[in-house]
Amino acid sequence: MKNGVMMQYFEWNLHNDGKLWVQLKEDAKHLHDIGITSVWIPPAYKADEQQDEGYAVYDLYDLGEFDQKGTVRTKYGTRHELEEAVTALHENGIAVYLDTVMNQKTGADYTEKFMACEVDPENREQVIGAPVEVEGWTGYSFPGRGDKYSPFKWHWYHFSGTDQVYETGKRAIYLIQGEGKKWSEGVDGENGNYDFLIFNDVDFDHPEVVEEMKRWGVWIAQTLDADGMRLDALKHIKNAFIADFMHNVRASRGKEFYAVGEYWSGDFESLEAYLDAVDHQIDLFDAPLHFKLFTASQQGRDFDMRTLLDDTLVQKYPTLAVTFVDNHDSQRGSSLESQVKSWFKPLAYGLILLMKEGYPCVFYGDYYSMKGEGSPHRPILDILLDARRSRAFGEQTDYFDHPNTVGFTRSGDAQHPDSGLALLLSNGEDGEKVMSVGVMHANETWHEITGSYDDELTIGDDGKALFKVHGGKLAVWVRKKD
C-alpha cells in the first residue's frame, strides 16, 4: 500500500445516538478523497450497556442484531447499518479493520459459585489468604441470541480471574481456582503478572476458550468481510494465543489479512520482545513515539528535538510500526491520559504523515471532534494528507541536528509529478536550515503550503536551499506547480 493512511474512526466521548455507522457510510467518499486508505472501526459487538464504547464486552456475536442488555443496536448502530458502512468503504477502496476485544467479558446473565483466592492488585502472583467459595457474575447464556452463530456458553471455568464478585462488599481481584488455573504466561510483567486487566479475564490456557475464540475470529472476519484487525490489550493476552489466532484467521482470509496490536508501553524493549514472541506476524502501534510526542508537547523548547525518534518502533522496526499522535486511550479524561498538547499536534502529524517510514493513523478526535467540539486541526490535516498523497515520495534525508529545529526532505520520484518536499519543525524560535532535495530539483521554484510563508525560494544548482520555519510551528515546502 503506497503511502497508506489509517483513520481511527471514533473517540471516547461520542454521543450514544446509534448513528456512527450511518455517518461512516455517508463519509466513505470523503475519506477516500482526502487520502484515507483504511479505517479502524470501534468494537462492533454488544457491550454490557448501550452507552458503552464496546470494550466492556458482553456478546461478541451480537453486532447490533439481537435484543440483549436492553437494546438491539450498539452505541454505534445496528448490524445492518454496519454492513452498509463496510460496503461503502470497500466501494471507495478503503480497507476495514475491526477492533478485536478478546481479553475480557462482563455483563453476565447469572451468578455462579466457585473457589477463588484474592490477590494483591500490585503483585497478582501474591495470594492474599486461603481459597474461599465466592459467587460471581460469570455465567453467560445470551438469551436474546440463543445458539445462533455459536452454541458456546461461558462459565466461571472459562476465566482465569475476576473482579465481578460483590457479596464481599469490596472490589477485589480474584484468581479463580481449579484444575490448571493460573495466570497466563506470555503476558506483560507489570504488577507481577498483567494477565488480569478488568472484569472477567478470559482464560487463554483453556482449550475450549482457545477453540471458540479462533472460530469467532474467522466468523467475524468473514461476516463483515474485514480486511484486518486491531488487537486490543495485548499486554494482557497470552502471546502464543495471538500468534495461533492470527495464523488461523489468515488461513481463512489470506496471508495479506492485516493486524496491528495495541501494546500500551513506552518501553521500546517491551514492544520488541513482543514482536519476537509472535514471530513478527503483526504490526504494533508505536506507543514509544506517542509518549515522545506527548513529552515534547509538555516540555516545549526544553525538549531536545534531535531525540524525537530515539528508541521508537518506527526507528527500529519501520515496517511494523503504526505511528499515531493520540487515540481514545490517550485523550483527555481517559484512563491512560497522555494527550499531546494542541500547539504541537500539527508538528506531530507533519512528522508521521510525511516521513517515509511507518503506517500513520489519524485520530477521529483530531480530525473531526472530541466531546462534540469541532477540531481546530482539520485544515492542517487536510493539507498534510494531500501532501502525503501527492508529494511524500522518494528517498528521505534527515536533518535532526539541532535541539529546537529539525526536519527532513523527500526527493520525490518520476512516477509522481511535482513530488518531493522539505519539512521543518521548530519547538523554539524561528529557525532555518540548508537542506538538499536533490539536484533533480535544481532551479525549481518552491513555496510553503501550510500558510506560514508567502514568499518563494529557488532550489540551487546543487539541489540545496535555505528553508525556514516559524517558532513553535511546522513548515512544508514543495515545488510550485506550473
Positions of PLM-derived features:
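Boundary/entry segment of secreted carbohydrate-active catalytic domains
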Residues: 1-18, 196-205
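Active-site-proximal helices and loops of the catalytic beta/alpha 8
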Residues: 2-7, 23-36, 45, 49-64, ...
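Soluble non-cytosolic domains of exported or imported proteins
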Residues: 15-22, 76, 80, 207, ...
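Active-site-proximal N-terminal segment of extracellular/periplasmic enzymes that hydrolyze or transfer
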Residues: 16-23, 27, 107-109
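Aromatic/His-enriched, Gly/Pro-containing loop or helix-boundary segments
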Residues: 62-88
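Core domains of carbohydrate- and sulfate-ester-processing enzymes
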Residues: 118-193
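Active-site-adjacent "subsite" loops/lids of carbohydrate-active enzymes
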Residues: 178-223, 234
